[in-house]
């Protein structure tokens, strides 16, 4: 599995994320994507030094802007049969990826998507107004696309590589998460959702 980890400057969170993910017993590679303009030189040097500890890590400068641009270059450079998309700032819980991989191994042609709305404990320090706005937006998306999932915009997923093969992300800001869910859906890929917890980042 190719694990894509975009980063700006949240280096301590990235280190913790890698430490947790590296314990998962699966053939994996880490693809760390950092910003040519926004990542500090000191952080870039630390990312490069991580290669000494993690031989299965490669780091790339993103070419197109925003998080969608980072994810896009990660997908292009992924070498494994499956692709995991997550954050390096701990807003996506790295402990949850092990279970997502287990489910993926039993459902080879499905997308495994983390879902904050399955349980009542999916949000931590999200803010009431933001919470309600997200709730309404997800409901509208569910009605519009007539699909059973509850969380269309949480970019914490595992994809079969062929679900994204040849696809270039068009919406580079936050809309990329919805875009790269809908594109495989149109190809007929099934989506399996698992409960996930979101926690506000403290870095980055």
Q: Where are the regions that the model predicts?
A:
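Short, well-formed alpha-helical segments that are part of the catalytic scaffolds
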Residues: 10-23
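Cell-envelope/extracellular polymer assembly enzymes that use nucleotide-activated donors
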Residues: 1-2, 29
